[in-house]
């Protein structure tokens, strides 16, 4: 378990790693997830659509999306595989996290992390299942990175 040292600068926090070395981590703004069909809120910050396809029946004006990161969405093959077998949630998360490490997604991940260092971000998704979707997996993956 990491011990926090309460020495802060504007964008960094200090902590002790498991080996007792002093390290610094970039602080992050709040990261939320929300179904794209829900109305925008003032606390949403930057609204980022993380689906590869545009949500059905939703106009761009009503969605009020600030950024559409198709590159960060699961591949079509992975999306279809999960759609055919929703019980394979853990397998989906593992495969999706592997895709996030590949070059097409890496620059989008960097852009997202850079925004998170400056302002709140809400990841938007269209799936009906609010607990098992790519935005949930992406949020978990980003939070594991500190």
What are these regions (language model features)?
Residues 12-14:
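Tryptophan (W) side chains
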Residues 20-146:
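Residues lining hydrophobic/aromatic ligand-binding pockets adjacent to catalytic sites
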Residues 1-9:
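Extreme N-terminal basic, low-complexity initiation segments
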């Amino acid at each position: 378990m990491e011990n926090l040292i309460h020495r802060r600068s504007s964008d960094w926090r200090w902590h002790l790693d498991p080996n007792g070395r002093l390290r610094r981590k970039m602080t992050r703004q709040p990261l939320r997830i929300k179904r794209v069909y829900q109305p925008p809120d003032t606390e949403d910050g930057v609204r980022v659509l993380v689906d590869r396809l545009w949500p059905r029946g939703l106009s761009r004006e009503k969605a009020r999306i600030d950024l559409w990161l198709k590159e960060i969405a699961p591949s079509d093959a992975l999306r279809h595989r999960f759609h055919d077998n929703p019980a394979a949630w853990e397998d989906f998360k593992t495969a999706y996290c592997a895709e996030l490490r590949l070059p097409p997604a890496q620059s989008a991940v960097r852009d997202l992390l850079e925004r998170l260092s400056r302002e709140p971000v809400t990841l938007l998704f269209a799936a009906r299942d609010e607990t098992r979707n790519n935005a949930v997996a992406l949020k978990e993956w980003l939070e594991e990175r500190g």
